[in-house]
């Protein structure tokens, strides 16, 4: 977020780190990206997640640990956002749960937070989804307003 004028006129409202899922650790996860960490001022989480979703082409929650606030964002995306595509990821076969798509190993993805919280109903959680967007409208608007600092 830029305040004032000049190259040093920047106020950081938060940051989000996205990293590719690791097939060895997380499973194939449809070759998606996951949240690696975030620090966000109150109210800016969804905006930063929008940016991360647009820049990665598809994003999941952290595969091992998610805060309650972040879970609420993922649930909102999966149930209420008409501008996103929600893709259900499957649970790996080593969880001893029935898989949703046992013939497709490409969507197998670690479901630690969803499974820890919801057990056999893990698939109903927004934490079990991959979120995609078409295009980069939020990023484009932030760039046009010189409000996005990318590193």
Regions found by a protein language model. Give the residues of each.
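Conserved acetyl-CoA-binding loop-helix of GNAT-fold acetyltransferases
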Residues: 35-55
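Terminal substrate-recognition subdomain of acyl/acetyltransferases
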Residues: 16-24, 57-151
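A conserved beta-strand-loop-helix scaffold within acyl/acetyltransferase catalytic domains
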Residues: 1-39
